[in-house]
Amino acid sequence: MESIEQQLTELRTTLRHHEYLYHVMDAPEIPDAEYDRLMRELRELETKHPELITPDSPTQRVGAAPLAAFSQIRHEVPMLSLDNVFDEESFLAFNKRVQDRLKSNEKVTWCCELKLDGLAVSILYENGVLVSAATRGDGTTGEDITSNVRTIRAIPLKLHGENIPARLEVRGEVFLPQAGFEKINEDARRTGGKVFANPRNAAAGSLRQLDPRITAKRPLTFFCYGVGVLEGGELPDTHLGRLLQFKKWGLPVSDRVTLCESAEEVLAFYHKVEEDRPTLGFDIDGVVIKVNSLAQQEQLGFVARAPRWAVAFKFPAQEQMTFVRDVEFQVGRTGAITPVARLEPVHVAGVLVSNATLHNADEIERLGLRIGDKVVIRRAGDVIPQVVNVVLSERPEDTREVVFPTHCPVCGSDVERVEGEAVARCTGGLICGAQRKESLKHFVSRRAMDVDGMGDKIIDQLVEKEYVHTPADLFKLTAGKLTGLERMGPKSAQNVVNALEKAKETTFARFLYALGIREVGEATAAGLAAYFGTLEALEAASIEELQKVPDVGIVVASHVHNFFAEESNRNVISELLAEGVHWPAPVVINAEEIDSPFAGKTVVLTGSLSQMSRDDAKARLVELGAKVAGSVSKKTDLVIAGEAAGSKLAKAQELGIEVIDETEMLRLLGS
């Protein structure tokens, strides 16, 4: 049996290794929850044996050394980390310690914030002008990232307002919204570039680029949460007051910051944020709870590595470790072949996970994945579970290579990968049963033709029994034929037939989306429908004409043009129209004749809307004569900013474009 000294040495060595991977290499090998568990184990042993604590123990310092490639900045005030709690009992114990330590009987109020999963930074302003920025590094010395921080549009280069201190060091978190993260990885997969495991790694990798021009292309954003150096000026005597003052000076502060009057209110805040977490649009891993009074903070003071007046209340882990049993290959509606890891089932964020996407061959190569490997699985919100990385230090001896198929696993057709694309595709088209199934499932889905009651299992049976080959065949189905399907009685069959009949009356935009043209989502379909007005005009459009539609570039234009150039696709459309699929004739909208504040304007929506869905908002805006675009440019007239608006809002502010919130949008929609 190992001695206590040996256990301590092994734990410290393991933690130092993972700190190096996390802080220096930006390539963590284990989940945060596993790191937290190891740290707790080390703390418990050191608490029982204080005589064995060493100055270089991971419990005695904050972080890890900065990268040598950057020059260094020494923090005038150390950037400490926070202690963690993981359950209500631990938080209530922290609350009691705070109450017991305070010498006065004054009431304690708490300032509660989101614990953003990004990169902590320090930004120094002198006379209101940004002069330097640094990472936290080891808490004493960080990396000079001034040039990169200056590219982040959410961070003001000059503060505005009155009574700005001569020297003010603002601290906060640089992070990457989920939409930006997905776009970066989507682009990387298409071009064969580096794919990031999660938004935190993407933010760190983007911020620590030696070339600021690369950082500038990444949609990073920032929220401030505290202050370091303060000279030649004053700040309010509460933490919340300071954050509100920062906001007045032009610094971004999360609108979820909340003042809680009691421990019970803190717990309610925690559970509300946990409930809202999937809809925030960016990653968090808990909430941060701080004593609001600066005077009380001073009374409480610090321990060696963290303040006594604050704590991070972390959510259940979204990452766990498990083993890959096998890798199988699925075929999508456009023929894309996606490798899927079959896992030893593991609970991640409260859900039992047994499968995880591997995206494509490049991702398997990037991960260095082999069948039998121990891997880290991540599940965030409603996102499909993903393999974050392979735990190479624990690779079994009997792992097997993952062999990507050269022929479709469903129909046997050749698999091809177009140069410049990361995705390999089955060339079988509609002769491939898998593509046929997925195309039909998309066609009847709620946001497409919206055929109520026609679920995936019905589509699977219809294809397997050869009842349906194209979307037009769906409208030829009879109740008698449907009754022959498994678990389909006469009444259910008639309901499906009725739903198909009802679905024949649709909109041009829904019809285009239902066709499943590559790269044409709902917003693009709506833009095409609004711009061309009729199917005939769209079918006849050249690639150059298609690019005149907002947010349609050369890639999307080529896919649309090629789709309508294919005779088989035109035949299916003709059959659908012959079966009675139709939509209202286009109403020619003259923006000058519409009495609407949105008429003739190019509008961009950003952030989360709480009163109506984004799709409904887009539809109403188009009805009132607006053109809804997906990105902000000099051509944009108006930006509507919901909650957690990020880089689009920052760009709009930089360009001087008018910005309104959801409340104002609803007022104008009703006017």
Curated annotation (Swiss-Prot):
InterPro entries documented for this protein: BRCT_dom (IPR001357), BRCT_dom_sf (IPR036420), DisA/LigA_HHH (IPR041663), DNA_ligase (IPR001679), DNA_ligase_AS (IPR018239), DNA_ligase_CS (IPR033136), DNAligase_adenylation (IPR013839), DNAligase_N (IPR013840)
Positions of NAD(+) binding: 32-36, 81-82, 113, 136, 173, 290, 314
UniProt keyword annotation of NAD present: yes
Residue intervals of the BRCT domain: 593-671
Taxonomy, superkingdom: Bacteria
UniProt GO molecular function: DNA binding; DNA ligase (NAD+) activity; metal ion binding
SUPFAM superfamilies per record: BRCT domain, DNA ligase/mRNA capping enzyme, catalytic domain, Nucleic acid-binding proteins, RuvA domain 2-like
Active-site feature positions: 115 (n6-amp-lysine intermediate)
GO cellular component terms attached to this protein's record: cytosol
Enzyme class: ligase
GO BP term, example: DNA repair
Alphabetical UniProt keywords: DNA damage, DNA repair, DNA replication, Ligase, Magnesium, Manganese, Metal-binding, NAD, Zinc
Catalytic activity: NAD(+) + (deoxyribonucleotide)n-3'-hydroxyl + 5'-phospho-(deoxyribonucleotide)m = (deoxyribonucleotide)n+m + AMP + beta-nicotinamide D-nucleotide
Binding-site residues for Zn(2+), renumbered to this chain: 408, 411, 426, 432
PANTHER family named among the record's database cross-references: CHROMOSOME TRANSMISSION FIDELITY FACTOR 18 (PTHR23389), DNA LIGASE (PTHR23389:SF9)
Functional note: DNA ligase that catalyzes the formation of phosphodiester linkages between 5'-phosphoryl and 3'-hydroxyl groups in double-stranded DNA using NAD as a coenzyme and as the energy source for the reaction. It is essential for DNA replication and repair of damaged DNA.
Family assignment from sequence similarity: Belongs to the NAD-dependent DNA ligase family. LigA subfamily.
Protein name: DNA ligase
UniProt organism field: Escherichia fergusonii (strain ATCC 35469 / DSM 13698 / CCUG 18766 / IAM 14443 / JCM 21226 / LMG 7866 / NBRC 102419 / NCTC 12128 / CDC 0568-73)
